[in-house]
């Protein structure tokens, strides 16, 4: 498990919500039927004072085992994109991580992660987002988050959605998933590193440093 976990939220309603989410077992049968046959393990990472919100896809197997979000190579890349060290990234009073599914969904026949079960976001997101009233910037990572929170603006797929990033500033930025499987995508789209990343880093620094 990561060494950067901060103390849990002390606000009673938030503490209760976090406990309820951590105890969620809605997908027990679904996960038992996967190749890994694993039990649910929701990775819960938010506090109400967070200013940066990351809505991502779902934990991978390594994150499932560590019980810490982005505790993998994807996290290394994401932290580089954001210009954040691990201590800042894992400070729940500054950064909230609310994936489309809080548990590792298992693998598909090709060895890739299964999609996040829609029941997870339907069940938990509204209540969680209601507590995050200090958020100044939301990052929508990957197609599932973008379709849910951008609606028709995300119909063209991840590339077109991310290419239109200027349309969503200053409160939101769509990003591709930082998986190393997307290295080819990054090579095909050099504008991402040249144009979007400098703005992303500046905006993240602004929202985390402004009192």
Regions found by a protein language model. Give the residues of each.
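A polyanion-binding, active-site-adjacent surface
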Residues: 3-208
């Amino acid at each position: 498990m990561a060494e950067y976990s901060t103390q849990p939220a002390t606000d009673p309603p938030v503490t209760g919500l976090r406990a309820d989410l951590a105890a969620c077992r809605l997908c027990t049968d679904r996960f038992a039927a996967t190749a890994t046959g694993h039990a649910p393990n929701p990775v819960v990472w938010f506090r109400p004072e967070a200013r940066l919100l990351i809505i991502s896809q779902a934990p991978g197997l390594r994150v499932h085992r560590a019980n810490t979000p982005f505790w993998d190579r994807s996290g290394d890349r994401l932290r580089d994109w954001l210009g954040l060290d691990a201590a800042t990234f894992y400070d729940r009073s500054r950064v909230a991580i609310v994936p489309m599914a809080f548990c590792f969904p298992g693998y598909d026949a090709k060895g890739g992660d299964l999609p996040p079960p829609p029941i997870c976001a339907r069940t938990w997101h509204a209540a969680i987002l209601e507590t995050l009233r200090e958020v100044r910037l939301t990052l929508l990572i990957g197609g599932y988050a973008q379709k849910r929170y951008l609606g028709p603006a995300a119909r063209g797929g991840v590339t077109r959605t991310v290419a239109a990033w200027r349309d969503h500033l200053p409160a939101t930025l769509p990003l591709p998933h930082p998986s190393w499987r997307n290295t080819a995508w990054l090579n095909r789209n050099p504008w991402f590193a040249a144009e979007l990343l400098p703005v992303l880093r500046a905006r993240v620094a602004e929202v985390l440093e402004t009192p």
